[in-house]
A protein has these predicted regions:
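Conserved pre-ATP/AMP-binding loop-to-beta segment of ANL
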Residues: 32-33, 161-180, 187, 212-218, ...
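Gly/Ser/Thr-rich phosphate-binding loop
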Residues: 238-241, 265-269, 280-347, 360, ...
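Conserved AMP-binding/adenylation subdomain of ANL enzymes
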Residues: 199-218, 226-266, 281
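ANL superfamily adenylate-forming
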Residues: 3, 41, 126-172, 187, ...
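Conserved AMP-binding/adenylate-forming
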Residues: 16, 42, 57-104, 222, ...
Length: 541
């Protein structure tokens, strides 16, 4: 293949990059005896972690996993989930983690859509393992205790103890991680993250979010490792920082603060809802959290009053960033120095910060033209942190990119100094407690109820979660009446709890456009006219 020579330059002679698992190799060499992972009463040194990862990689290779194969992982946070990430990287395979709160049918779809060859499934989810089985999935291994699967990950590691597995040679564009996101249709899409891109992401996070981080720091995990927290902990591994897990999937705030004090935790990645809960909990005053240097939050806007409360309790340690899975969190940053506890012109209320190092943001109109300061348009971004594209989804890729720019789907403006302000979303997606929720997914499940003929789900403001869903329903003609409690009980086993609408309303009809569509803005206007938005905000979460 002939590579055209750039005018006035030279075609790149090599696309080889570091395999991300080399960071583990480095830690085993330089910090081998230092603790790298803590969970409950167990801890592992970096040398032990490297050994477990090689053993798991050897087992996967023996079972036929090679470079480019996808390894699906559905698990709560635990040691073996963390090992699986580096084992996939080491082989040049692709780590495909899911949100452990998903339903079995949703995980089955992801198994098929990703083309997964192997499935590592936590023992608490036998129905997910059963649902995900398909002709392309060659084997299922169990994480932890349980009664399903060809064998357990623990058994595989024990069988291959002492194995030496080299880090596979990789190029910049070789995939390492399928980061599941969602489109406006509600179907999850696999954003392809690569070794070269993620090396930049790691470097950028260290430079912009937590400068000066070293092996003497410590990081507490308070979110699922399948998404943003997984990226955050990968960054920690680059500096030999130990990762500390909560003892169970239940978020125990007192235990979190106890761990912060006991291990002198210096950084946390979280979302505004969790941060608000931590700051308002009595434990914030019982434990010493003076070791915290960076409390990094993202995933949703944070109310100004909540910001001030967090600053007053924790000190000047808040760092905000704006970024999607497709850009691996690398769009803007609002560093601790710009989080002012006092209101005033200097406080820059409402901004999500300025462009990350090495990234460029453009506010564009529908025609792709760059808009002037304070003009509202779509937030678009270019730079090394942008993903390769969506796996096996040319239609989504065509919509997501324009003239090389990635289109976030978020609306906003930029001031004259380059600070970005998010003003809305181009889609109907809403964010509740840091989780993206796409109404169509929930609407489809509600419409399986025999008494419901039409439904519109939309996000509305909530003082606790940022936004919550409400479902406006119209009964099927001739159907028996259904109560709010009955519909909630019907929906509960069909959607994860975080996707459950906070309220269900029943109307005679939904507002429609001239084309027979149900515009969400008209539904929202009607909710407001009836005083229901205020009612929702006053309902206990």
């Amino acid at each position: 293949v002939t590579i055209p020579t750039p005018r006035g330059g030279l075609a790149r002679m090599s696309r080889r990059v570091m395999n991300l698992a080399h960071m583990l190799t480095q830690n085993a060499r330089r910090h081998g005896g230092r603790t790298g992972f803590l969970w409950g009463d167990k801890s592992w040194t970096w040398r032990e972690i490297d050994g477990h990862v090689s053993a798991l990689a050897a087992g996967l290779a023996e079972r036929g996993i090679v470079k480019g194969d996808r390894v699906l992982v559905h698990s709560k946070n635990c040691d073996e989930m963390f090992w699986s990430m580096f084992a996939a990287f080491r082989l040049g395979a692709v780590w495909v983690p899911t949100n452990f709160r998903l339903m079995p049918d949703e995980v089955a779809y992801l198994a098929t859509a990703s083309g997964a060859k192997a499935f590592l499934c936590h023992g608490d989810f036998p129905e997910h393992a059963k649902a995900a089985a398909n002709p392309g999935l060659e084997f299922i291994w169990r994480i932890g205790d349980g009664g399903f699967g060809e064998k357990s990950v623990g058994e595989v590691i024990a069988e291959h103890a002492g194995a030496k597995v080299d880090n596979a040679a990789v190029d910049y564009d070789d995939p390492c991680w399928f980061f599941f996101t969602s489109g406006t249709t509600g179907r999850s899409k696999a954003a392809v993250l690569t070794h070269g891109q993620m090396a930049f992401v790691v470097t950028n996070h260290l430079a912009d979010l937590m400068p000066g981080t070293t092996e003497t720091d410590a990081s507490l995990v308070v979110a699922p490792l399948s998404h943003g927290a997984g990226v955050h902990q990968l960054v920690q591994a680059a500096r030999g920082v130990p990762t500390i897990l909560l003892p169970s999937e239940k978020f125990d705030i007192a235990e979190a603060f106890r761990l912060i004090e006991a291990h002198r935790v210096s950084n946390i990645f979280t979302v505004p809802t969790i941060l608000k809960m931590m700051v308002e909990h009595p434990a914030v005053d019982r434990f010493d959290h003076s070791s915290l240097r960076f409390v990094i939050y993202a995933g949703a806007p944070m109310y100004r009053e909540d910001q001030k409360a967090a600053l007053n309790k924790l000190g000047p340690v808040l760092v905000q960033y704006f970024g999607l899975g497709e850009v691996t969190g690398n769009i803007t940053v609002m560093p601790a120095s710009l989080h002012d506890p006092e209101d005033g012109p200097q406080a820059r209320i409402g901004t999500c910060g300025f462009e990350r190092t090495g990234m460029q943001v453009s506010i564009q109109g529908d025609d792709g033209r760059e808009l002037k300061a304070f003009e509202t348009g779509e937030i678009c971004v270019i730079g090394p942190a942008v993903f390769a594209g969506y796996y096996d989804n040319p239609e989504a890729n065509a919509k997501a990119f324009r003239d090389g720019w990635f289109r976030t789907g978020d609306l906003g403006h930029m001031d004259e100094e380059g600070f970005v302000y998010i003003t809305g979303r181009a889609s109907d997606m809403y964010i509740s407690g840091g989780s993206n929720i796409y109404p169509r997914e929930v609407e489809e499940k509600i419409l399986t109820h025999p008494a419901i003929g039409e439904v519109a789900v939309l996000g509305v403001p909530d003082p606790f979660w940022g936004e919550v869903g409400v479902a406006v329903c119209v009964a099927r003609e001739g159907a028996a009446a259904v109560s709010e409690a009955e519909l909630a009980a019907f929906l509960a086993p069909k959607v994860p709890r975080y996707k459950m609408p906070k309220r269900f309303f029943f109307w005679e009809a939904l507002p429609k456009s001239g084309y027979g569509k149900i515009p969400k803005r008209l539904v929202r206007d009607e909710l407001e006219a009836r005083g229901l938005l205020e009612l929702v905000s006053k309902t206990d979460s």
